[in-house]
Regions:
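Positively charged n-region of N-terminal signal peptides that target proteins for export
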Residues: 1-7
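Acidic (Asp/Glu) and glycine-rich low-complexity loops/linkers
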Residues: 22-49, 54-146, 153-158, 162-164
């Protein structure tokens, strides 16, 4: 009888600690943010691509390009989405910022490449992760930004801007 009570107490304690730990883990996951900072000179170009979520480009200071991104979701897996920043072009002077969903091979100045994964990628019914990207751009940097399912806002640009959105 005593071992039954001890076992029941152990099970109850384990369940209680699991219930208490779950909100803390979920809260930590919801802060899935990304930060990157690097140099970009006037006359070079920023390329930003997002499939599901907004892109906001703002005037920055100095010669630093600052990228922040935050993942939002209800039922999807945020680990299936990663933010990638690459420096390309002459002397690696241009910068490409992409949100890559599982099942995509790559992204460059021209956008996304590779096959989509209908079961697990953004297109599937299992992943509702959206990415909110904010980029601070120095004066004189050309901007090319596109989102499939989200807004593209550019404020304070002092060079050429190409902004596209399919549904946003």
């Amino acid at each position: 009888m005593r071992s039954l009570i001890v076992a029941a107490t152990l099970v109850a304690t384990t369940l209680a600690s699991a219930i208490v730990a779950t909100p803390a883990r979920a809260q930590q996951n919801e802060d899935n943010s990304f930060k990157w900072s690097g140099d970009i000179q006037s006359g070079h170009r920023l390329y930003a691509h997002n499939l599901n979520g907004s892109i906001k480009v703002e005037a920055g200071t100095g010669s630093k390009l600052d990228v922040t991104a935050r993942k939002h979701w209800r039922r999807g897996n945020p680990e299936d989405v990663k933010i990638v920043v690459t420096q390309v072009g002459t002397n690696k002077g241009d910068v490409v910022v992409c949100a890559l969903w599982k099942g995509q091979n790559s992204c460059d100045e021209d956008g996304y490449h590779g096959r989509k994964d209908n079961d697990n990628g953004w297109w599937g019914d299992k992943n509702d992760v959206s990415i909110e990207i904010t980029i601070k751009v120095p004066a004189g940097v050309n901007i090319e930004a596109s989102s499939v399912n989200g807004s593209v806002d550019v404020d304070g640009a002092t060079a050429e801007v190409i902004a596209k959105s399919v549904n946003g």
